Amino acid sequence: MLKPRITARQLIWISAFLLMLTILMMTWSTLRQQESTLAIRAVNLGASMPDGFSVLHHLDANGIHFKSITPKNDMLLITFDSPAQSAAAKTVLDQTLPHGYVVAQQDDDNETVQWLSRLRESSHRFG
C-alpha cells in the first residue's frame, strides 16, 4: 500500500489557511475586548483618595456592576465590562462623591486597543 504524501502545494495551502485562521481568531478576541476603566483622583495634592468601600456602595446602590476597584498612585481605578457601565458609573460618582474629586475615563496604554477604538468611533466618516 502506498502512503499518501503531502505535496509542497498542499503544504503551502494548509499553512496559509492556518495562518489566516490564527489572524482571524486574534482579531476577533481583540475586538471583543470592551473593558473600560474610570480613574478617581483628588483635585488637591496631598488629599486622600476616596474609600473604595464607599465607591462600591454608591455603585451597588445604583445597580452598576464592576470588575475591580484598585488603588494606584494616589488614584482609584475602577474597571468595568463595558463603556456603558463606565459612563453610568461616572454619572453616579460625579453626583455622589464630595467636591474635590475628579472622575475621568482612564486612557488605555495598549496601542492596539487605542487604534481599534479610533476606528470604531470614526467609522461613520468613511464613504
Curated annotation (Swiss-Prot):
Interacts with EnvZ. The chain crosses the membrane at residues 11-31. This is Modulator protein MzrA. It is a single-pass membrane protein. Residues 32-127 are periplasmic. Residues 1-10 are cytoplasmic. One of its GO terms (molecular function) is protein kinase binding. One of its GO terms (cellular component) is plasma membrane. Belongs to the MzrA family. Keywords: Cell inner membrane, Cell membrane, Membrane, Transmembrane, Transmembrane helix. InterPro entries: Modulator_MzrA, SecD-TM. Modulates the activity of the EnvZ/OmpR two-component regulatory system, probably by directly modulating EnvZ enzymatic activity and increasing stability of phosphorylated OmpR. It is found in: Cell inner membrane. It comes from Salmonella agona (strain SL483).
